[in-house]
Amino acid sequence: MLSSTDLVQAVTADLGKIRETAPLVLSLTNSVVQPLTANLLLAIGAVPAMLNDAEEAVDMLRSGTGALLVNLGTVTREQGAAMQTAVREANRLNIPWVLDPVAVGALSLRTRLAGQLKEQSPRIIRGNASEIMALAGYSSVTKGPESTSSSADALHAARELALHTGAAVLVTGRTDYSTDGRQVTATENGHAMMSRVTGVGCSMGALSAACAAVSPTPLQAAVSTAVLMGIAGEMAFEQSPSPGSFAVSLLDSLYALSPEDVVRRARFLSL
């Protein structure tokens, strides 16, 4: 288990690598969050590519993509087939990919698709408590895409899911938990206003893909995601305490985020 000092150093290293290498993140994501997702990736220093077609996704993966995001937020049967194709190609090319199983457990099409995708070697699975519990095979209660359980409630399911899939699992909530099934890191950065803006959670999936493109391990990428987004959320609220302006300030805060901010603000919870 890394010390808090080691964790902070790893997060700042990931931030620096993203800005130095500008990884291309191919996002097969939902239509509601595409603008925020693309702008968030640009703000942190990555390069977004937003596609839905299977043939074009394969072409993009072969052109030097750093990571792939698969987000099920507004999935259709056609898009689901494209996701399957993209995942197979990413695995063939050894490109890390992230599964964001939005509203899994609440709706049948995406629940079936997520069950298939989780068996195809995602590097990171990012979800709220209800989504992670459902994907792990536990009963959960959702309110649309929102969780009615706490992230701590899903920790056991997250560890089981990580061991089963080989992925790092990032459970987001008031406390964010990152686990590979053996190690667990809990981070307490963030602000409640983040839950009042559509797409922030989904954009964390995109950020985790950017981190996965540069980080030495999926678990470290998950931790970096939680810390960087959480700190940016805190900084954004200090500037803009209302939802509309907060969304803009979140992008500004990610753009301005410095290693010193990480050192000063990162908060890890002892388990």
From Swiss-Prot:
Is the keyword Ubl conjugation in the record?
Answer: no
Enzyme class, spelled out: transferase
Cofactor (UniProt): Mg(2+)
Give the intrachain disulfide bonds: none
One BP annotation, GO: thiamine biosynthetic process
Keywords on this record?
ATP-binding, Kinase, Magnesium, Metal-binding, Nucleotide-binding, Thiamine biosynthesis, Transferase
Task: Name its pathway.
Answer: Cofactor biosynthesis; thiamine diphosphate biosynthesis; 4-methyl-5-(2-phosphoethyl)-thiazole from 5-(2-hydroxyethyl)-4-methylthiazole: step 1/1
Alphabetized InterPro entries for the sequence:
Hyethyz_kinase (IPR000417), Ribokinase-like (IPR029056)
**Record-listed ATP binding positions:** 126, 172
From the UniProt record, list the reaction(s) this protein catalyses.
5-(2-hydroxyethyl)-4-methylthiazole + ATP = 4-methyl-5-(2-phosphooxyethyl)-thiazole + ADP + H(+)
Q: What is its EC number?
A: 2.7.1.50
Q: Quote the function comment for this protein.
A: Catalyzes the phosphorylation of the hydroxyl group of 4-methyl-5-beta-hydroxyethylthiazole (THZ).
Designated name of the protein = Hydroxyethylthiazole kinase
What organism does the record attribute this protein to? Akkermansia muciniphila (strain ATCC BAA-835 / DSM 22959 / JCM 33894 / BCRC 81048 / CCUG 64013 / CIP 107961 / Muc)
> Lineage of the native species?
Bacteria, Pseudomonadati, Verrucomicrobiota, Verrucomicrobiia, Verrucomicrobiales
Instruction: Tell me the name of the encoding gene.
Output: thiM
